[in-house]
From Swiss-Prot:
This is Aspartate carbamoyltransferase catalytic subunit. InterPro entries: Asp/Orn_carbamoyltranf_P-bd, Asp/Orn_carbamoylTrfase, Asp/Orn_carbamoylTrfase_sf, Asp_carbamoyltransf, Asp_carbamoyltransf_Asp/Orn-bd. Its EC number is 2.1.3.2. Belongs to the aspartate/ornithine carbamoyltransferase superfamily. ATCase family.
Amino acid sequence: MEWKGRDVISIRDFSKEDIEVVLSTAERLEKEMKEKGQLEYAKGKILATLFFEPSTRTRLSFESAMHRLGGSVIGFAEASTSSVKKGESLRDTIKTVEQYSDVIVIRHPKEGAARLAAEVADIPVINAGDGSNQHPTQTLLDLYTIKKEFGTIDGLKIGLLGDLKYGRTVHSLAEALAFYDVELYLISPELLRMPKHIVEELRERGMKIVETTKLEEVIGELDVLYVTRIQKERFPDEQEYLKVKGSYQVNLKILENVKDSLRIMHPLPRVDEIHPEVDKTKHAIYFKQVFNGVPVRMALLALVLGVI
Protein backbone atom coordinates (compact mmCIF):
# COMPACT_ATOMS: atom_id res chain seq x y z
CA MET A 1 0.00 0.00 0.00
CA GLU A 2 1.14 3.56 -0.74
CA TRP A 3 2.38 5.18 2.48
CA LYS A 4 2.61 8.83 1.43
CA GLY A 5 -0.52 10.69 2.53
CA ARG A 6 -1.84 7.69 4.47
CA ASP A 7 -3.85 8.12 7.69
CA VAL A 8 -3.02 6.03 10.77
CA ILE A 9 -6.35 5.64 12.59
CA SER A 10 -6.76 2.02 13.68
CA ILE A 11 -4.52 -1.03 13.82
CA ARG A 12 -7.36 -2.72 11.89
CA ASP A 13 -6.31 -0.70 8.85
CA PHE A 14 -2.92 -2.44 8.88
CA SER A 15 -1.84 -5.71 7.31
CA LYS A 16 0.99 -7.74 8.80
CA GLU A 17 3.19 -6.47 5.97
CA ASP A 18 2.34 -2.86 6.90
CA ILE A 19 3.34 -3.54 10.51
CA GLU A 20 6.64 -5.09 9.43
CA VAL A 21 7.39 -2.05 7.23
CA VAL A 22 6.95 0.25 10.24
CA LEU A 23 9.10 -1.96 12.49
CA SER A 24 11.94 -2.26 9.99
CA THR A 25 11.84 1.49 9.24
CA ALA A 26 11.94 2.22 12.98
CA GLU A 27 14.96 -0.05 13.37
CA ARG A 28 16.76 1.78 10.56
CA LEU A 29 15.91 5.23 11.93
CA GLU A 30 16.91 4.30 15.48
CA LYS A 31 20.34 3.29 14.18
CA GLU A 32 20.68 6.53 12.19
CA MET A 33 19.47 8.61 15.14
CA LYS A 34 22.07 7.06 17.45
CA GLU A 35 24.82 7.65 14.89
CA LYS A 36 23.90 11.19 13.80
CA GLY A 37 21.54 12.60 16.44
CA GLN A 38 19.65 15.01 14.18
CA LEU A 39 18.36 13.75 10.83
CA GLU A 40 16.98 15.83 7.96
CA TYR A 41 14.25 13.69 6.40
CA ALA A 42 11.48 16.08 7.50
CA LYS A 43 13.33 19.36 7.04
CA GLY A 44 10.78 22.07 6.21
CA LYS A 45 7.83 19.90 7.32
CA ILE A 46 5.47 20.84 10.17
CA LEU A 47 3.64 18.50 12.57
CA ALA A 48 0.50 19.76 14.34
CA THR A 49 -0.27 18.03 17.65
CA LEU A 50 -3.90 18.42 18.77
CA PHE A 51 -4.37 16.96 22.24
CA PHE A 52 -7.92 17.25 23.57
CA GLU A 53 -7.00 14.82 26.37
CA PRO A 54 -3.97 14.76 28.73
CA SER A 55 -0.78 13.10 27.53
CA THR A 56 2.86 13.06 28.55
CA ARG A 57 4.58 10.26 26.64
CA THR A 58 2.59 10.22 23.40
CA ARG A 59 2.69 13.97 22.82
CA LEU A 60 6.35 14.45 23.80
CA SER A 61 7.34 11.32 21.89
CA PHE A 62 5.74 12.60 18.68
CA GLU A 63 7.31 16.02 19.17
CA SER A 64 10.71 14.45 19.83
CA ALA A 65 10.28 12.21 16.77
CA MET A 66 9.50 15.17 14.50
CA HIS A 67 12.44 17.19 15.83
CA ARG A 68 14.75 14.16 15.38
CA LEU A 69 13.61 13.98 11.75
CA GLY A 70 14.55 17.65 11.28
CA GLY A 71 10.98 18.97 11.20
CA SER A 72 9.12 21.39 13.47
CA VAL A 73 6.03 21.22 15.68
CA ILE A 74 2.99 23.39 16.42
CA GLY A 75 -0.16 22.57 18.38
CA PHE A 76 -1.84 22.52 21.78
CA ALA A 77 -1.66 20.24 24.80
CA GLU A 78 -5.19 20.91 26.06
CA ALA A 79 -8.41 21.98 24.38
CA SER A 80 -8.87 24.92 26.78
CA THR A 81 -6.05 26.79 24.99
CA SER A 82 -7.75 26.49 21.59
CA SER A 83 -10.89 27.93 19.97
CA VAL A 84 -12.71 24.70 20.88
CA LYS A 85 -13.35 26.44 24.19
CA LYS A 86 -15.27 29.09 22.23
CA GLY A 87 -17.44 26.41 20.66
CA GLU A 88 -15.51 25.71 17.45
CA SER A 89 -16.35 22.32 15.94
CA LEU A 90 -13.74 19.58 15.54
CA ARG A 91 -14.30 19.75 11.78
CA ASP A 92 -13.43 23.47 11.65
CA THR A 93 -10.45 23.01 13.96
CA ILE A 94 -9.02 20.33 11.66
CA LYS A 95 -9.64 22.34 8.48
CA THR A 96 -7.93 25.34 10.10
CA VAL A 97 -4.91 23.46 11.44
CA GLU A 98 -4.22 21.70 8.14
CA GLN A 99 -3.57 25.11 6.57
CA TYR A 100 -0.52 25.43 8.84
CA SER A 101 0.89 21.90 8.76
CA ASP A 102 1.87 18.81 6.77
CA VAL A 103 0.64 16.12 9.20
CA ILE A 104 -1.73 16.09 12.19
CA VAL A 105 -1.54 13.97 15.35
CA ILE A 106 -4.78 13.99 17.36
CA ARG A 107 -5.87 12.63 20.73
CA HIS A 108 -9.54 12.99 21.62
CA PRO A 109 -11.88 11.58 24.31
CA LYS A 110 -14.58 10.61 21.78
CA GLU A 111 -14.37 7.33 19.89
CA GLY A 112 -14.30 7.98 16.17
CA ALA A 113 -12.90 11.53 16.47
CA ALA A 114 -9.66 10.60 14.71
CA ARG A 115 -11.58 8.96 11.85
CA LEU A 116 -13.68 12.11 11.46
CA ALA A 117 -10.52 14.24 11.42
CA ALA A 118 -9.05 12.02 8.70
CA GLU A 119 -12.20 12.35 6.58
CA VAL A 120 -12.09 16.14 6.86
CA ALA A 121 -8.35 16.71 6.36
CA ASP A 122 -6.45 16.55 3.07
CA ILE A 123 -3.17 15.84 4.90
CA PRO A 124 -2.27 12.67 6.88
CA VAL A 125 -3.90 12.25 10.30
CA ILE A 126 -2.42 10.00 13.00
CA ASN A 127 -4.60 8.80 15.88
CA ALA A 128 -2.91 9.25 19.27
CA GLY A 129 -5.89 7.70 21.09
CA ASP A 130 -9.65 8.14 20.69
CA GLY A 131 -11.56 7.37 23.87
CA SER A 132 -11.39 3.69 24.80
CA ASN A 133 -11.28 2.71 21.13
CA GLN A 134 -7.80 2.57 19.52
CA HIS A 135 -4.20 3.64 20.10
CA PRO A 136 -2.38 2.30 17.03
CA THR A 137 0.98 4.02 17.53
CA GLN A 138 1.26 2.61 21.05
CA THR A 139 0.61 -0.84 19.60
CA LEU A 140 3.36 -0.44 17.03
CA LEU A 141 5.89 0.62 19.65
CA ASP A 142 4.78 -2.30 21.84
CA LEU A 143 5.41 -4.74 18.99
CA TYR A 144 8.75 -3.08 18.28
CA THR A 145 9.71 -3.45 21.96
CA ILE A 146 8.80 -7.15 22.02
CA LYS A 147 10.70 -7.81 18.80
CA LYS A 148 13.79 -5.98 20.09
CA GLU A 149 13.76 -7.99 23.32
CA PHE A 150 13.12 -11.45 21.90
CA GLY A 151 14.22 -11.14 18.26
CA THR A 152 10.76 -12.34 17.25
CA ILE A 153 7.10 -12.07 18.21
CA ASP A 154 6.11 -15.57 17.10
CA GLY A 155 6.09 -18.37 19.66
CA LEU A 156 5.62 -16.16 22.73
CA LYS A 157 3.09 -16.37 25.56
CA ILE A 158 1.82 -12.86 26.21
CA GLY A 159 -0.36 -11.80 29.12
CA LEU A 160 -2.51 -8.64 29.15
CA LEU A 161 -3.31 -7.59 32.72
CA GLY A 162 -5.74 -5.12 34.27
CA ASP A 163 -8.34 -2.98 32.55
CA LEU A 164 -9.10 -4.95 29.40
CA LYS A 165 -12.57 -3.38 29.03
CA TYR A 166 -11.73 0.31 28.77
CA GLY A 167 -8.00 0.13 27.95
CA ARG A 168 -7.53 1.19 24.32
CA THR A 169 -3.89 0.06 24.30
CA VAL A 170 -4.83 -3.58 24.95
CA HIS A 171 -7.63 -3.55 22.36
CA SER A 172 -5.21 -2.44 19.65
CA LEU A 173 -2.40 -4.71 20.83
CA ALA A 174 -4.56 -7.84 20.98
CA GLU A 175 -5.79 -7.23 17.43
CA ALA A 176 -2.22 -6.76 16.14
CA LEU A 177 -0.93 -9.86 17.95
CA ALA A 178 -3.47 -11.95 16.01
CA PHE A 179 -1.11 -11.60 13.02
CA TYR A 180 1.50 -13.60 14.93
CA ASP A 181 1.79 -17.10 16.37
CA VAL A 182 1.29 -16.21 20.04
CA GLU A 183 -0.73 -17.48 22.98
CA LEU A 184 -2.70 -14.68 24.60
CA TYR A 185 -3.59 -14.64 28.31
CA LEU A 186 -6.33 -12.14 29.25
CA ILE A 187 -6.08 -11.45 32.99
CA SER A 188 -8.63 -9.10 34.53
CA PRO A 189 -11.43 -8.73 37.09
CA GLU A 190 -14.77 -10.03 35.79
CA LEU A 191 -16.04 -6.45 35.48
CA LEU A 192 -13.13 -5.48 33.22
CA ARG A 193 -12.94 -8.39 30.80
CA MET A 194 -11.90 -7.83 27.22
CA PRO A 195 -15.06 -6.95 25.20
CA LYS A 196 -16.69 -10.15 23.98
CA HIS A 197 -16.73 -9.10 20.31
CA ILE A 198 -12.94 -8.60 20.35
CA VAL A 199 -12.32 -12.01 21.96
CA GLU A 200 -14.65 -13.73 19.48
CA GLU A 201 -12.96 -12.02 16.55
CA LEU A 202 -9.48 -13.03 17.80
CA ARG A 203 -10.59 -16.65 18.19
CA GLU A 204 -12.06 -16.60 14.67
CA ARG A 205 -8.61 -15.52 13.46
CA GLY A 206 -7.17 -18.66 15.06
CA MET A 207 -5.66 -17.14 18.18
CA LYS A 208 -5.24 -19.31 21.27
CA ILE A 209 -6.71 -17.37 24.21
CA VAL A 210 -6.86 -18.06 27.96
CA GLU A 211 -9.14 -15.84 30.09
CA THR A 212 -8.62 -15.74 33.86
CA THR A 213 -8.96 -13.50 36.91
CA LYS A 214 -5.94 -15.02 38.69
CA LEU A 215 -2.54 -13.60 37.78
CA GLU A 216 -0.63 -15.90 40.15
CA GLU A 217 -1.91 -19.00 38.34
CA VAL A 218 -0.53 -18.02 34.92
CA ILE A 219 2.38 -15.63 35.46
CA GLY A 220 4.89 -18.51 35.50
CA GLU A 221 3.90 -19.38 31.91
CA LEU A 222 4.44 -15.94 30.45
CA ASP A 223 7.21 -14.45 28.30
CA VAL A 224 5.63 -10.98 28.34
CA LEU A 225 3.33 -9.44 30.95
CA TYR A 226 1.67 -6.27 29.64
CA VAL A 227 0.26 -4.38 32.63
CA THR A 228 -2.37 -1.63 32.43
CA ARG A 229 -3.82 0.73 35.01
CA ILE A 230 -7.50 0.72 35.93
CA GLN A 231 -8.81 3.64 33.85
CA LYS A 232 -10.80 5.65 36.38
CA GLU A 233 -11.70 8.37 33.87
CA ARG A 234 -13.56 5.89 31.62
CA PHE A 235 -15.91 4.49 34.30
CA PRO A 236 -19.57 5.58 34.15
CA ASP A 237 -19.69 5.87 37.97
CA GLU A 238 -17.20 5.82 40.84
CA GLN A 239 -18.80 2.83 42.58
CA GLU A 240 -17.93 0.56 39.66
CA TYR A 241 -14.34 1.87 39.76
CA LEU A 242 -14.01 1.30 43.53
CA LYS A 243 -15.04 -2.36 43.10
CA VAL A 244 -11.99 -3.09 40.95
CA LYS A 245 -9.46 -0.49 42.15
CA GLY A 246 -6.21 -2.16 43.21
CA SER A 247 -7.21 -5.57 41.81
CA TYR A 248 -3.61 -6.48 40.94
CA GLN A 249 -0.12 -5.43 41.89
CA VAL A 250 3.05 -6.77 40.33
CA ASN A 251 5.71 -6.86 43.07
CA LEU A 252 8.85 -8.81 43.93
CA LYS A 253 6.88 -11.55 45.70
CA ILE A 254 4.77 -12.42 42.66
CA LEU A 255 7.93 -12.47 40.52
CA GLU A 256 9.57 -15.23 42.59
CA ASN A 257 8.33 -18.02 40.30
CA VAL A 258 8.48 -16.44 36.85
CA LYS A 259 10.64 -17.28 33.85
CA ASP A 260 14.07 -15.68 33.90
CA SER A 261 13.23 -14.26 30.48
CA LEU A 262 9.90 -12.67 31.52
CA ARG A 263 9.62 -9.07 30.40
CA ILE A 264 7.15 -6.66 32.00
CA MET A 265 5.67 -3.86 29.90
CA HIS A 266 3.30 -0.99 30.70
CA PRO A 267 1.99 1.80 28.43
CA LEU A 268 2.16 4.18 31.43
CA PRO A 269 1.14 6.15 33.41
CA ARG A 270 1.01 3.66 36.25
CA VAL A 271 -0.81 4.12 39.54
CA ASP A 272 -0.13 1.24 41.93
CA GLU A 273 -0.28 -1.80 39.63
CA ILE A 274 3.52 -2.19 39.44
CA HIS A 275 5.46 -1.60 42.66
CA PRO A 276 8.49 0.69 42.15
CA GLU A 277 10.71 -2.09 43.56
CA VAL A 278 10.17 -3.95 40.26
CA ASP A 279 11.80 -1.12 38.26
CA LYS A 280 15.34 -2.28 39.01
CA THR A 281 14.76 -5.92 38.06
CA LYS A 282 15.82 -7.34 34.69
CA HIS A 283 12.14 -8.06 34.01
CA ALA A 284 11.10 -4.38 33.80
CA ILE A 285 11.32 -2.86 30.32
CA TYR A 286 8.60 -0.19 30.48
CA PHE A 287 11.08 2.70 30.34
CA LYS A 288 12.81 1.09 27.35
CA GLN A 289 9.31 0.94 25.89
CA VAL A 290 9.00 4.72 26.34
CA PHE A 291 12.25 5.27 24.40
CA ASN A 292 11.07 2.97 21.61
CA GLY A 293 8.15 5.30 20.97
CA VAL A 294 10.51 7.79 19.35
CA PRO A 295 11.93 5.65 16.49
CA VAL A 296 8.52 4.08 15.84
CA ARG A 297 6.82 7.47 15.58
CA MET A 298 9.73 8.76 13.49
CA ALA A 299 9.05 5.86 11.13
CA LEU A 300 5.32 6.62 10.90
CA LEU A 301 5.86 10.34 10.33
CA ALA A 302 8.54 9.74 7.69
CA LEU A 303 6.38 7.17 5.90
CA VAL A 304 3.15 9.20 5.77
CA LEU A 305 5.07 12.34 4.78
CA GLY A 306 6.70 10.36 1.97
CA VAL A 307 10.21 11.45 2.93
CA ILE A 308 11.74 7.98 3.32
